[in-house]
């Protein structure tokens, strides 16, 4: 969370580095892609610029900065937070199931987007090299190789933690937005009439004159708003106010640059890349420094997105919608600075694969946008339901209007499906299938295990304990709930008579708040039998050993259950493989290996 001592400008600069990289690098390719398909006549340029301005106002300012960011949980934002808010508001049943399904789709689309964004950002920046005198004949393969190498270096650096270099991200992005503003203003000065394009009537005229083709242009216009969802998703890192303050500056810089590119497009309609050609035309001397700044900005944008993917996956793990994975904490003072190796390398391979498949940023733009509009539509639907169930009912009409705009953009983006848009669906289907198999598998496994209730367990436990053949010391037994006894505990204590002088059932309960940590030792359930319950927020990092020491628990051995799944069902077979490949509960929580004792239970599913 944001420190209270942080100044106004510190918060703004940090936000620019951590939140606005993606949306801030959109000017590199947005208008270039649009005008490759639509001739840059005066009516078209004014109409499209008007659409860009109003897309940024409606989808980013209204939907995210105003509506979504008013829905935080202890300062946290994002799709999973919306789901947690809704679960509290709705009655159990179909509505909850629908919200769960929506949030799974939203999370999957965001994770799929985590592959396309770094690929298009880095490729589009590297393509600016061909405008440097002497490099005009650089081959496409060389450009892809340079982009792939930048991506590899970026992903290798993740393990070290970006804590040390993150301090430079903010100032670099301030420089980037400053450069966008200055180049935009210089270009606007050559054609001041372009400022009139902010009027919505040009967008309306464009729709009136072009009909259905104008509707499909929306699928390219959305490129200007990609990364808008980061305002809400990254709220937990910086707080609401610094992000909104920074957005005002970013918004102005983007609008000025898009208007400048529009003025340039009217005079140089045949330009290969409007941003790069515009800057090169203004100053040949400053073009190379600007290109270096562009590459740095796209790396920062990609970095923010990778950190966002780690954060989403961690939320998914702790809310039990995703399998456990090895998590490393790369910062001693920032809880949100995490690294998930398996996700990092998988993401790197996919980014390079996508670069090789699409080869050019304009080709990638054909696949880009579908996931973003899908995420925005889901956010709109979930927000509307929340406002309808709270005291903020007056926001419902605005949320409905914004969601309708989201749906219009989503439908226009369906046109991209045959042109590479299907990659968005393929990339999102991997996490979506994993989430579905994992959540359904966990439920089926819990039913198949047939756990005992505490009363039935105590009948046998007390008889065995009374015999007095108990092992000296303390034995810990991990259970999902302290009062529901899993089969492995029954096997250990009742069947095998492995019973200690002191036996403690330990359970971890994740609350629907992002942060907060409570631990409680409940004593006297039976002779030598206690329960230790840890309640933690779903973003909270738990040090179990520290909590045990705090309650003066000196454990001799820690028991945990391992399920050996036997099944003929192909879906449960996949679930079983995922379970075997991913760390188990005790590995995830980094407990001392010397004290651990896994107990295998064979389960028929």
Curated annotation (Swiss-Prot):
Keywords: Cell inner membrane, Cell membrane, Ion transport, Membrane, Potassium, Potassium transport, Symport, Transmembrane, Transmembrane helix, Transport. GO terms for cellular component: plasma membrane. It is a multi-pass membrane protein. The chain crosses the membrane at residues 17-37, 45-65, 96-116, 140-160, 165-185, 211-231, 246-266, 286-306, 338-358, 367-387, 394-414, 417-437. One of its GO terms (molecular function) is potassium ion transmembrane transporter activity. It is found in: Cell inner membrane. Its main location: membrane. Belongs to the HAK/KUP transporter (TC 2.A.72) family. Transport of potassium into the cell. Likely operates as a K(+):H(+) symporter. This is Probable potassium transport system protein Kup. It comes from Geotalea uraniireducens (strain Rf4). The gene is kup.
